[in-house]
């Protein structure tokens, strides 16, 4: 969403992400994808900062002695769950949500705007800004584009690229454990 709104919140208009150029000037799907990945990396970076802060607070102020006593690795290592005693981290973690929605959204943009050229990006953004009111025919077209989870390579390839990017972006960071 930030890639299509110049890095601004749709609710407040506040600049909350990286500034982007006016999305109506994008001339290719690849430009939109690149903008999305820039925004994504920015959000991951700031999410990781928050996550590391939460992990440190848990370690310092919220030990889990009972749960640690029930975990064979914590007992073996003599360390609390929130101090890296477990085989697998149980503290605040970074999870990827929204893969299907993002893949579906990109599929609509790719198919309708850049392949079929049945709508402009400007028209699509206007439809989204109006929650599809007055754009029912466009909404029907968008709903007809292949959706993730139906074993369709068109959208599955987009989802795979998103998942791969997420994996490589997130695993570039290390947690406190």
Q: What would you call each of these model-derived segments?
A:
Residues 1-140:
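Structured mid-domain segments that build the active-site/substrate or prosthetic-cofactor binding neighborhood
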